[in-house]
Amino acid sequence: MQTKQELENWYEQEDPWDYTITEDDIYRKHFYLTVLEDLDGTYERALDIGAGEGFITKDLPAKEIHAIELSDTAAKRLPENVKRVSTPIGKYDLVLVTGLLYNQYDHRAIAKMATDAASKHVCIGGIVDWLRPYVFGELIRSFEFPYRE
């Protein structure tokens, strides 16, 4: 499993995943946000588990946005409209878990945290073969994107 120090080292470089300049990631972000707005318009409370620097988090359609991020370095780059929390605080209309349900993370604990914190929607994203063992409730929509090069 990836250590906190490895995460800190990874985030020494701003936008280490190149999300802000990779067309596939920009498209996926736009797609997620469009689907979420179509489902509910604006959520009261949203939680992004593993928010990183807030690439998607900052634009979530919610009045109150919380983020859980283990890397202090990444969390320092979270935008002002996002409040960092160490654990979920109550229930959230929307819980976002993207790129996190993988073996290098404690994926079972993350999946449990997401289902426990959600009162309405859980939006998950990642490599589909790694997502299959999880049940988050009724599947509303499912989409598959090609993995970026």
Feature names for model-found ranges:
Residues 119-128:
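Conserved beta-strand signature within the Rossmann-like core of class I S-adenosyl-L-methionine
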